[in-house]
Curated annotation (Swiss-Prot):
Belongs to the YbaB/EbfC family. Changing K82A: Forms homodimers, but does not bind DNA. Homodimer. Can form tetramers and octamers in solution. Changing K16A: Forms homodimers, but does not bind DNA. Binds to DNA and alters its conformation. May be involved in global regulation of gene expression. Binds specifically and non-specifically to DNA, preferentially to the 4 bp broken palindrome 5'-GTnAC-3'. Affects expression of a wide variety of genes, encoding both structural and metabolic proteins. This is Nucleoid-associated protein EbfC. The gene is ebfC. GO terms for molecular function: DNA binding. Keywords: Cytoplasm, DNA-binding.
Length: 99
């Protein structure tokens, strides 16, 4: 069966529109990664930019440096995982060929 080049171009235009829509949806994603019973909270957008870091000062003085660093790392990893999951949900079934 021969492929019509015009149909192919129409499909590519549709794919481009889908990708543009997905990019818009991803840019709207905002998640919060949390660690240590919410001692550290990190807000991240869909492009993996950290928008806000919150530290519950009530617990801050009681933490040693290693524990605090571990909580920051855990909160960042939690936020990254949540962004990836949101992207996966928003792109599922939209892109062709398993893109």
């Amino acid at each position: 069966m021969a492929v019509n080049p015009l149909d192919f171009l129409k499909n590519m235009s549709s794919v481009k529109n889908n990708i543009d829509n997905i990019k818009k949806e991803i840019s709207k994603i905002t998640v919060c990664g949390k660690a240590g019973s919410n001692i550290v909270t990190i807000e991240m957008d869909g492009e993996f930019n950290v928008k806000k870091v919150s530290i519950n000062k009530e617990f801050f003085d009681d933490l040693d440096n290693d524990a605090f660093e571990q909580m920051i790392k855990s909160a960042l990893n939690d936020a990254v995982s949540k962004v990836k999951e949101e992207i996966k949900l928003k792109t599922m079934g939209v892109l062709p060929f398993g893109m």
